[in-house]
């Protein structure tokens, strides 16, 4: 196994296991807030977490994703986008366009598995797109309307981004180009910048040290953007 293949395998494992780690309590954190989440985690196991989340009766969490009950990777909307990215790259390669992403969503992505910016973009595609757009031709309207939504600077496009980096080892420019086509369907500004950062970082980590990859990936973010501020804040917390 080559070094790059080993890194890609590890990236897949990290992607899926990380998703499963947070999945049981995802709704709790959004519904009940940080304090309730912290209390639950403190009750079922020591913090900081060093294993999957434990299960306790009486809480509305996904038992099948908890420590002691895991038998597989449970379906998740975040992982769906990783597979969609692979499908689109297999079909379109370097020529992937935002229109291709829109068609793929309509043909392969259940509407009920979209949320926030993606749901808003999907709704516009259904309402304004030509009936036969998923099969051929143009959408019949300017696709930039899909990203005109209240969530377009949220992290959804970042969640969709990592595969574009993995398949471009040592080629951050191509990774940035591909992920921009995908991200632009539903996001703008920092929503796209964050996705570019994730994809570029993934491409660079295949051939560079983590420190080198991070340093170079930051150069793809506009100065004073929310994305660069967030990255530098994270760095400061590690200092």
List the predicted regions and their residue ranges:
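Structured, active/binding-site neighborhoods that engage oxygen-rich ligands
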Residues: 1-239
